[in-house]
Structures are given as structure tokens and as C-alpha cells.
Amino acid sequence: ESIDEIDPITGDVISEQPIQHITIYPAKHYIADMSTRDQAFAEIKSDLAAQLTKLRLEGKVLEAYRLEQRVNYDIDMIQEIGFVNGIENYSRYFDGRKAGDKPYTLIDHFIENAKTFGDGSFLTVIDESHITVPQIRGMYNGDQARKKTLVDYGFRLPSALDNRPLKFEEFSRLMDTM
């Protein structure tokens, strides 16, 4: 058996030489240690219990049932295989953030790299700013509207609202030079 380099167009083997080194990346780039996972599961279960109580008091029995089934399935999948579709809706628990905290973004990486490899600043260029800047605000508002519906109807825990784009004010505070 071997791993060969293949021409993507013809399907022919490109080289008869054995590959000496190869990097294979995971399909999903999220890893959490066991203590982080255990803490996350405890918080998820606590928030689930609170949300189930709220839904039942509002007479939303179907929504409560739906949410309980969904979250318990998600927890089981994460425990068994380390992943579930929609795991991003639990990102706050695994990141150790509180409800409403700003999510981590690529901009955080830019800031950290600017501090590590430079003077701590970086330039942000926004082309077509008359279109792009309003879209930054719109991304947050649209995301919240969609996810609020999922929460209200028992498809997701309220923590799903914390897996979101930045608010415009958060984005503006992160920009060093724009």
C-alpha cells in the first residue's frame, strides 16, 4: 500500500518516488481537553435545565421536548466521537466565555500577531466602505434574528446566540488603524 501524488485533472500518478513526508489536517479544527469538556458539559446541562423550565412555564411543551432531545443527542455525540454538526452553537462553553461575551475571531489572531511580530498595530482597509460598513452591523442583527427564532422554538439553547459575528462597536474597538 502507498500514498501517491495524483494529478487532479488526469488522475495519473505524478511520481513513482514514495512520499517521505505529508501533513494531513483534520476535517474539523476544534480540540478540547477532558477537563474543559467536562466543565462544558456541566454548564450545558445546567443551561438546558433552566431553559426547559422556562419553556415549560410558558406552556411550550413541544419546544421543551425538542430542545431536550437535541441537546442530549449533541452531548452524546460529542462524548462519543468528539464532534457533532452544530458544535459551534456550544462554542461559548468550550471557550470559557460568559453569556454575551465577544466571540474569538480572526481579528484577535491579527492583533496577537501584530504584538508578537511587530509594533502591535496593523492596518485595516475597507474597500467599498459605504456598502461594507453597514454590512458589519447587519451581519450581527441578521444572525441574532435567525438564532432567536431557533431558541424560541426549542431548536437551540440560548448559548447559540453567543456564536455570532462581532457587533459593530466590538469590531470598531478592535481596529487599530482603519
For every predicted segment, state its role:
Residues 1-177:
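Extended, highly charged clamp/arch subdomains and adjacent linkers
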